[in-house]
């Protein structure tokens, strides 16, 4: 009995009907089917996804990154990586991103928390964060309304803001200060179209997409640097001008993309 063939047959019998497991890999090297990869857990593995940071980061840090003109960090440091290993993302992570002064704007430090029971210290008067109705759930499960939902806390010079995810409106805390400043705050402009309409109208040239490449490209690069820190469990120092990691040769080598597997090369020719 060819044990390798027998094992492969077991994997094939698990593949859902109608699923092209080879095509599912796209550029990634082939892995035998495993229900820990599909359906929902693929993002938890370094070979396939970017963990919670790559998944939720774009829905939480997008406005901060865009409107504060953050660009790329000069340093990313792992503060906590619970259950670190070389195969899949930690059970919980705390990362610190440092951005330099940008013109007249001061330096910014972002601390990212994700994972099981890994919460930031909440400021007085925080209250409860509301769960947005437009937040997608995992595998169609019902979202749980809890005190602390995905979101952000922004500490400015004189004010503290809290916000949720997916473009939710920021609010000032504590509530007493928000009420005192209510007549001084600018109106939040209403979007002329929703998320789906904007995409279609942008395709037709009637609107500008709200997340063009010049916005989401650098934002995704920030997340890639964070994921590298999670994977290597090392602080990285990044040269924003040369776009190279200057304190670790192995980490710097990872900036060069792994060649796509055979059959996918033509899609990566410039």
Each PLM stretch: what is its role?
Residues 48-53, 84:
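Glycine-rich "substrate-gating" loop/helix at the edge of Rossmann-like oxidoreductase active sites
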Residues 40-50:
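Flexible glycine/proline-enriched surface loops and loop-helix/loop-strand junctions
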Residues 1-7, 11:
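Single conserved hydrophobic/aromatic residue that forms the stacking wall/gate
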Residues 31-42, 68-71, 192-200:
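Active-site-adjacent bridging/hinge elements
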Residues 56, 72-270:
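Glycine-enriched catalytic-core subsegment of oxygenase/oxidase enzymes
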Residues 17-20, 60, 195-196:
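Stable alpha-helical elements in mature extracytoplasmic
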Residues 9-35:
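Rossmann-like flavin
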